[in-house]
UniProtKB/Swiss-Prot annotation:
Quaternary structure and interacting proteins, as annotated: Homodimer.
Name of one Pfam family that matches: FA_desaturase_2
Record localization: Plastid, Chloroplast stroma
Binding site for Fe cation 2: E175, E228, E261, H264
Principal location listed in the UniProt entry: plastid
Pathway: Lipid metabolism; fatty acid metabolism
Tissue: Ubiquitously expressed with a preference in leaves, flowers and stems.
Protein name, entry field: Stearoyl-[acyl-carrier-protein] 9-desaturase 5, chloroplastic
Gene Ontology CC entries for this record: chloroplast; chloroplast stroma
UniProt organism field: Arabidopsis thaliana
Binding site for Fe cation 1: E137, E175, H178, E261
Family, per entry: Belongs to the fatty acid desaturase type 2 family.
Amino acid sequence: MAMAMDRIVFSPSSYVYRPCQARGSRSSRVSMASTIRSATTEVTNGRKLYIPPREVHVQVKHSMPPQKLEIFKSLEGWADETLLTYLKPVEKSWQPTDFLPEPESEGFYDQVKELRERCKELPDDYFVVLVGDMITEEALPTYQTMLNTLDGVRDETGASPTPWAIWTRAWTAEENRHGDLLNKYLYLSGRVDMRQIEKTIQYLIGSGMDPKTENNPYLGFIYTSFQERATFISHGNTARLAKDRGDLKLAQICGTIAADERRHETAYTKIVEKLFEIDPDGTILGLADMMKKKISMPAHLMYDGQDDNLFEHFSTVAQRLGVYTAKDYADILEFLVERWNVETLTDLSSEGHRAQDFVCGLPARIRKIEERAQGRAKEAAKNIPFSWIFGRNIRA
């Protein structure tokens, strides 16, 4: 559906993007996606059964000018020599069984008993955050699908030999271990309702994600740079909390996953660094565009069949525990601005200079807004039941 628009207004829901002005350079190819679900209305239409609990929004497609496809073709040699070095050979990689009780061992039951004893020291709110992180990792099919929507770098055949396609498949293979490991650990812990968790994973993969990357690899790689650092921080903090509570094995697990995320973050930031080198104006415009729309978390369409605001509630608990906070969001942006030398960019268009000023000033603005929001959040705190922990209430 093609349509002209000066401004798109979205729902005021906490995790729906704020209004942003459509630029003239954008493709006119957009599609409307209705994402409304009522928890109390039984829906018989098969398609509607899988629509996530979000408001109507507009999806922009293929916003990158076709002439810029050549940039990514020309970078294949660089990707082969630089990007792929951030992958680890399978034979040198850790596997989930390295951290779990050994089922073939005579001591298996004792090992499981020890694991469950350690987990007794961990509070319910910690498990809510750990489960949310695990569910996010388990939706990996969606993330590989997202990368393969990006023009110029997608895997065109499913087994393409281009370095971009090799990276996507191998990155996915490395990430696949994260959800596997956390899932098995949580299953053995006996502290969580695995059926509700499994339902949430199925709902989430079926719902997909809406990162607003528009098939545009500039936007896509900016998004992944931000997200990999966010997951590095989140897993690092769950490791710290597990250590504080005496579960050193779980701390090791979360720390190992965090190390993978840090390596992947470095790879994606290298791509964007290269884009800034080749096309500073186009890249700064892409960065400003993504920040105006706000970076959504990859599991923002999370649903368990009961709570239409599940992701918001999970995020609130993560914020309260200090696992992933609005301060982290601002810190990540500030880190990337410094990493990519955004403040010192030259040879920009007037629009590029405005984008540069916006991005460089944004971390301070986010922090000011967050300070005010924290006061309101404390006043509005309430108990929220989480199906993942058998319906027990958590302060959020």
